[in-house]
Swiss-Prot record:
BNR repeats lie at residues 61-71, 377-386, 644-654, 1028-1038, 1070-1079. InterPro entries: Sortilin_C, Sortilin_N, VPS10, VPS10-sortilin, WD40/YVTN_repeat-like_dom_sf. The gene is VPS10. The lineage of its organism: Eukaryota, Fungi, Dikarya, Ascomycota, Pezizomycotina. It comes from the Eukaryota. PANTHER family: SORTILIN RELATED, SORTILIN-RELATED RECEPTOR. Residues 1-21 form the signal peptide. It is a multi-pass membrane protein. This is Vacuolar protein sorting/targeting protein 10. It is found in: Golgi apparatus, trans-Golgi network membrane; Prevacuolar compartment membrane. Residues 1397-1420 are annotated as: Disordered.
Length: 1420
């Protein structure tokens, strides 16, 4: 039933037909007024019991007479604490009242009584708090969270007895659900018993908390004594980026999204064990762009947003197992909230009403076009649709997107009854212009009637006369909701409304009871119904499928296989097959019909030529793991401004946008499906689907003329852009300046943001908790570019309000976790300082290390920072061709910096020779200037390569191979297998690359790096370089080829290709076993000069692309690309098998990265295991593999888990010593910065590396603790101490025992002290010295002596312990008397002894010699 938006309820218009009134002339109306708005109103099914919640005051009301009278639920402790009221979805007797604390209440008898239960958590902030089992109403999960200060953990509890008891399921689970979440799940299937207990949980990634790393786990034992098993969603493999799961009828859906795309992958199961990826007939499914509609027990129905408009969709229906979807009808009408004009007619399967957009083409071209909506109906579950008719006229009805009432829009449980508001004509008009239309034959015929219906399960009453019933006491309301019991089995209705009060609003619930009029109602005569069938049980079919050949069948195009006919039986169709048309019978097909080409058994080459002098640039629009299709899209722009597109990795190219004068291509910085093509006049084109389609947009201004970025992209909102254009730049000079505009709909509408800007950027809200609208802009002060003073401003409302952060900045940079600003010095425009923010609102000045000698802070380079710490390169020497600087590393909030590595090379453009290994955290390489003193005097720079395995805390030279690729020894030698200044491996780095995308490592080839360089004392010329590889993240290296090569990884490292650099060639080298062996392959008959080799950025493809030109005899003019396709190679034609339960059983093994200086195999305090393909297996990895298998043991903390603290520096022995004359940061600041902090620690010179997960072991940063002000009580609860009488007896008792034993021995030992006996060999007496009764007490006597000797030390130690907790005036240990081994030695007379364990705390790690130690650590 639909309720008019503006229903005047001063009186009710009732459509009834009366005989002579025998009982009552009208319904009984009861009115109840409430001060606050009722929310969460619901009926207990098949009863007159109704409940709702007062959301403001926290009370719950109940009525047992269908709303005529109301009472507050008054249970001890409940009043005023109701946070939410939740009915059980499948048990009509149960409901839950949830508080915001840990105490809640449940009823199991329709609110007659309530039982209290508690859990140790508050309700979840993000999820519906209760998750119900579909078949056992006693099984419920509660999603909550628990906070300790700022540290909050998600906690999930479960019960199997209706919350008589509750147990912790897991911590930090993002979303959990029962496998059996609906009553219909598993119907018709023989499911294993354990499925009834199965729970699915979405949890964070092992190494990352970002959404793209989320995993889906399951457990059949409530996660007891196990971490759960990762669900093999895709062909037996786990998939990362799981957003959530949803249960619909008998199906469970899991949605996943990869990083850098909006496109989703949907996986489905109907048995909670076997999963399949859904296919939508070539249509993309994007995040927040699909709606799962009311479905049946035999198919799913999903509406998917069209490509460019969020308010137009396409309706799909699945086959019986939910895997393959076919299009039912296109251009369905949606709204921006995801609601779709779609409804199934109640009680009759297969009848669907939808609204579609008639002028969809105009709507997609322009956002301002008004939609023309038309209605259609289907009688075969959406396979075919036809117009709604009133006589000969088309009828259009308002549907879900216009609904203001709860429940169904058109139909009720009365079979065949359909009613709606709308109009006849060409399209749907305004709601207020509509009339009421009724059908009692399920929509076949509709009539315009001023009728209303009163419905119960057995009768339908029509009445053509309207009667008025006034509300009591002159009440006038604005109606909001008209509802009744869910099954429409009652003659009682509830009307909810509001009215203005003296202050604010007041709310009414009106009960309308027709029960007393029942005898006056005219019953509808039911005529005999016959079943008329045109053709007896004729089967119907629909839905084509693409033929897929069984694996291994198609070896040649002419081979044949038995496959799908292209038809399928309509899900839910129970027709009799015998004697009918069997269209879905499998048929014989030819292999050439399949999409995939049959394997050729060899590498395939495709060469293409272009009439240009050189290629200007190229970009990959990479299809991500959650994206559909098989394309590998590349876009190239040539020197002639021609743009070419290839969808098959360069095998075939086509020129695009030929008539447009495209001057630049801007790939989206955060979404790989998207690219923009810009002209100089402000016109532009973009693609959202990797070049499949293009759409034009008009910018508000031409691109800026200040060589600034024209487009700025939002990290999370694909359609949000900032355009920086040129204003008043008409060639006459004068006031030319840059102006920023923004759009939230891909340039459909532009809005002014700010003028006189240099740069504006969206700031990611991840980990900041900020608004999506957070924007930072650099604007010239007073809108005057001539003064060159830039101010940094931010806004969260498009600069309706703004915040000034700094008034004289040089630049700012944003990273995942930090915003870093370079500010000009107050006293000198040549000096800089650093400001840092995490939340984008509060900035703090960075504390730079004093041991970095910076005469004037002139330049900074913000380096890659993904490990909870910021890395900056600070320029020390800025003289051209002599540039170098220091890498400094921050703490976890980016404010306190320490020196990580000195004398790091930099070029004139500000780029530094620093690179982090991809796919493995904490490993990085850098090239340092090894002859700093000579460089300062004008000499050329000489480089050495350094490597770190603990995120910059320690750096070492790289160990060279023992032999070269020809089996010969190198001219230099290592010392004990360790590199020295005279003999180490050095590699050419970032500043020498023609293309910065050519990195040492790959995100998918974990642990493998390739580089060119040499073995010796310094890095030699690039022309003399050889090529090296490591397979263990840089611990050991091997020379693979003499000479310098360009390299590329493919298929996650299972294919590696080398091409000679700067040398004409016809051949390339490839390896299928991680570089252990190499084969030559001739890719061209004519020699070519190869400028670059590329593949998709994830390095997961088996295709490679060579970029160059022919130079040999018979060469063709222009430039050329060469596609090298390894997918047909026999050794790479079968996909590898990975069993998540037995990861080493088939084609993979588990690889553990290690720290070269730690014998226990720990890296960052844990042991991680990664999937790597066995080098000897002939198979391919395929789409991006989830490499990280598990994080195993958490390790005890060691020195490698710490780095030097602020104003401390590393020593040659590995310890950290305070820089002379400097003080550490005030340790008490933790108490003021965090009001919930209980304690602070005295500085030790060490701080934990932000990445480490270690526990226990050496706590080098926490030794002497002190209570924060006014937190003494909490402190001593956390650190109970021995004092008073207990301390007295601990000292006294051992002394008394030792003295007593000594006295006893002295008086009873026959030898006495002082007697000397020689030559006596007799057995001796009871107290002979060899007797146990003598030897033991002698030891005790020795103990007495030791105690007496050590007593001063004991007292001193106890004094230090006590004064460490509570400051004692005048204590000699009020300050720690040493900070390094040297200062400890200088004060040696102050100490009686040092326990052996304390040596490592001071940094006495063993090194082979001091000189080597100086090289490894002195440069840090």
């Amino acid at each position: 039933m639909i309720l008019r938006r503006l229903l005047l309820a001063g009186s009710l218009l009732l459509a009834t037909a009366f005989t002579s009134a025998k009982k009552a002339d009208g319904p009984k109306i009861s009115v109840t007024k409430f001060k606050d708005e009722p929310v969460n109103l619901f009926y207990f099914d098949d009863s007159d019991t109704v409940m709702f919640q007062d959301g403001k005051n926290g009370d719950v009301y109940v009525s047992r007479d269908a709303g005529a009278n109301w009472d507050i639920v008054d249970v001890s402790g409940m009043r005023g604490k109701a946070w939410s009221l939740l009915p059980h979805p499948t048990d009509r007797t149960k409901a839950y009242i949830m508080s915001n604390g840990g105490t809640h209440w449940v009823t199991e008898d329709q609110a007659k009584s309530w039982r209290e239960f508690t859990v140790d958590a508050d309700l979840s902030r993000y999820e519906y708090p209760l998750v119900f089992h579909g078949k056992d109403s006693n099984r419920v999960m509660l999603l909550g969270h628990k906070c300790n200060g700022l540290d909050c953990k998600e906690k999930t509890y479960y019960t199997t007895d209706g919350f008589k008891t509750a147990h912790l399921l897991m911590e930090n689970g993002r979303h959990c659900a029962w496998a059996v979440s609906t009553p219909t799940f598993g119907e018709g299937l023989d499911l294993p018993k354990e499925v009834n207990d199965r729970i699915f949980c979405v949890v964070s990634g092992l190494h990352s908390s970002w959404a793209e790393a989320n995993r889906l786990l399951y457990s059949d034992r409530f996660f007891k004594d196990e971490q759960g098993t990762e669900v093999p969603l895709d062909n037996g493999r786990a998939v990362s980026g799981v957003i959530r799961t949803a249960s619909v009828q008998k199906y469970i859906l899991a949605a996943t999204k990869s990083a850098r795309t909006n496109e989703l992958a949907l996986f489905v199961t109907d048995n909670a064990s076997t999963w399949h990826r859904t296919e939508f007939d070539g249509h993309r499914v994007e995040e927040d762009a699909y709606t799962i509609l009311e479905s049946t027990s035999y198919s799913l129905q999903v509406d998917v947003v069209s490509t460019y408009s969020s308010t137009i969709g396409t309706l799909f229906t699945s086959n019986s197992n939910g895997t393959y979807f076919t299009r039912n009808i296109e251009h369905t009408n949606r709204n921006m909230y995801g609601f779709v004009d779609f409804e199934k007619i109640s009680s009759i399967q297969g009848i669907i009403l939808v609204n579609t957009v008639k002028n969809w083409e105009d709507v997609e071209k322009s956002n301002g076009v008004q939609k023309k909506v038309i209605s259609k109906i289907s009688f075969d579950d959406g396979r075919t649709f036809q117009p709604l008719k009133v006589g000969k006229h088309d009828l259009h009805l308002h549907s879900v997107t216009d609904a203001t009432n709860s429940g169904r829009v058109f139909s009720s449980p009365a079979p065949g009854l359909v009613m709606g508001v709308g109009n006849t004509g060409g399209h749907l008009k305004d709601y207020l212009d509509g009339d009421l239309f009724v059908s009692d034959d399920a929509g076949i015929n509709l009539e315009e009637k001023l009728w209303t219906m009163l419905i119960n399960m057995n009768s339908v009453i029509k009445a053509s006369n309207w009667h008025k019933a006034s509300l009591p006491d002159g009440v006038q309301i604005r109606a909001k909701v008209l509802t009744t019991a869910p099954g429409s089995t009652t003659l009682k209705f509830l009307l909810l409304g509001s009215a203005k009060a003296d202050i604010g609003m007041e709310y009414y619930i009106i009960s309308i009871d027709f029960a007393e009029m029942e005898d006056a109602l005219v019953r509808r005569k039911t005529s005999k119904i016959g079943c008329q069938i045109e053709r007896e049980n004729e089967p119907d079919a629909d839905g084509h499928k693409h033929p897929d050949a069984p694996e291994g069948v198609c070896k040649n195009p002419d081979d044949k296989f038995t496959g799908s006919s292209g038809f399928r039986l309509i899900p839910g169709n129970v027709c009799i097959r015998e004697g009918g048309v069997d269209l879905d019978k499998q048929t014989e097909r030819v292999c050439s019909e399949t999409f995939k080409n049959p394997p050729a058994g060899q590498i395939v080459v495709e060469k293409s030529f272009f009439t240009a002098d050189y290629y200007k640039d190229y970009f990959y629009l990479e299809r991500k793991e959650s994206s559909k299709g098989e394309d590998e899209t590349v876009i190239m722009i040539t020197s002639e401004q021609q743009i070419f597109l290839s969808r098959d990795h360069g095998k075939k190219w086509k020129q695009i946008l030929e008539e447009e004068k495209i001057t630049r291509i801007e790939p989206h910085r955060f979404f790989d499906d998207v690219a923009y093509f810009l002209t100089n006049n402000g016109d532009g084109w973009y693609t959202l689907d990797r070049g499949d389609t293009f759409r034009k947009f008009k910018a508000p201004l031409p691109p800026n003329q200040d060589k600034l970025p024209v487009l700025s992209f939002h990290p999370d909102r694909r359609d949000w852009l900032i355009w920086t254009g040129a204003d008043e730049c008409n060639g006459n000079g004068g006031n030319c300046h840059s102006v920023a505009y923004y759009t939230t709909n891909l340039g459909g509408e532009w809005h002014f943001l700010m003028r006189y800007v240099r740069r504006c950027e969206f700031i990611s809200r991840d980990a900041r908790g900020s608004s999506d609208k957070l924007v930072f802009c650099e604007q010239f002060e007073n809108e005057n570019p001539s003064n060159k003073h830039l101010q940094l401003l931010s806004t969260e409302d498009w600069f309706a309000e703004k915040r000034l952060h700094y008034s004289n900045i040089l630049d700012f940079a944003t990273m995942q976790e930090f915003i870093i600003v370079a500010i000009r010095g107050e006293n000198s425009q040549d000096s800089l300082r650093i400001g840092v923010s995490i939340d984008g609102k509060t900035f703090a000045d960075a504390e730079l290390p004093a041991n970095v000698q910076i005469p004037i802070q002139r330049a900074y380079t913000v380096l890659e920072s993904r490990t909870h710490a910021a890395f900056l390169h600070v320029t020390i020497n800025n003289i051209e061709d002599h540039e170098y600087g220091s890498i400094i590393k921050s703490n976890s909030n980016g404010t306190s910096y320490v020196l990580s590595l000195s004398a790091v090379n930099r070029n004139s453009r500000g780029y530094a020779d620093f690179e982090k290994m991809q796919g493995l955290e904490g490993v990085a390489m850098a090239n340092v200037v090894g002859n700093v003193a000579d460089v300062e005097n004008g000499a050329a720079k000489k480089f050495r390569t350094m490597i770190t395995h603990n995120d910059g805390a320690e750096w070492t030279l790289m160990r060279p191979p023992d032999k070269d690729s020809e089996g010969r020894s190198y001219a230099c030698s290592t010392k004990g297998g360790k590199p020295t200044d005279a003999c180490a491996l050095h590699l050419h780095s970032y500043t020498e690359r023609a293309d910065p995308r050519d990195t040492y490592s790959s995100p998918s080839a974990v642990g493998i790096m390739i580089g060119t360089g040499n073995v010796g004392d310094y890095l030699s010329l690039k022309s003399k370089a050889d090529t090296f590889i490591t397979r263990d993240a840089g611990i050991t290296w091997e020379e693979v080829k003499k000479g310098k090569y360009q390299w590329e990884f493919g298929d996650s490292g299972s294919i590696i290709v080398l091409v000679p650099e700067s040398t004409p060639t016809k051949t390339l080298l490839y390896s299928l076993d991680e570089g252990r062996s190499w084969k030559d392959f001739e890719f061209s008959e004519v020699e070519m000069q190869i400028q670059d080799i590329s593949t998709v950025p994830s390095d997961t493809s088996r295709n490679f692309l060579l970029w160059g030109k022919e130079v040999g005899q018979g060469k063709k003019p222009g430039i050329a690309t060469v596609n090298i396709d390894f997918s047909g190679l026999k050794e790479r034609s079968k996909q590898c098998v990975l069993d998540e339960k037995k990861p080493e059983a088939d084609d993979y093994y588990l690889w553990e990265p290690k720290h070269p200086l730690q014998p226990n195999g720990c890296l960052f305090g844990h042991r991680a295991k990664y999937h790597r393909k066995r080098p000897d297996k002939d198979c391919y990895n395929g789409r991006e593999l989830q490499h990280l298998d598990s994080i195993g043991d958490i390790c005890e903390c060691t020195r490698s888990d710490y780095e030097c603290d602020y104003n401390y520096e590393p020593q040659s022995d590995g310890s950290c010593a305070r820089v002379a004359g400097l003080e550490p940061l005030d340790p008490k600041l933790v108490c003021t910065e965090n009001p919930k902090a209980v304690e602070w620690y005295e500085p030790t010179g060490y701080r934990r590396i932000p990445l480490t997960k270690c526990q226990g072991g050496k706590q080098l940063n926490h030794i002497v603790a002190h209570p924060c002000p006014n937190k003494e009580e909490e402190f001593f609860k956390k650190h109970p101490r021995l004092r008073g009488i207990g301390l007295f007896f601990v000292i006294l008792i051992p002394i008394c025992l030792a003295a007593t034993a000594g006295y006893y021995v002295y008086n009873h030992w026959d030898g006495k002290f002082g007697r000397i006996r020689l030559g006596e060999t007799g057995s001796g007496g009871l107290f002979d010295r060899d007797s146990l009764l003598v030897s033991i007490p002698v030891s005790m006597v020795a103990g007495v002596v030791a105690v007496i000797t050590a007593l001063p030390l004991l007292v001193s130690s106890l004094w230090r312990s006590v004064s460490g907790y509570v400051r004692v005036p005048g204590g000699a240990s009020s300050r720690r008397p040493y900070s390094s081994r040297d200062s400890f030695a200088a004060r040696r007379s102050d100490y009686v002894g040092v326990v052996e364990d304390e040596d490592e705390l001071l940094g006495t790690d063993d090194f082979d010699d001091d000189e080597e130690g100086d090289e490894r650590n002195g440069q840090v």
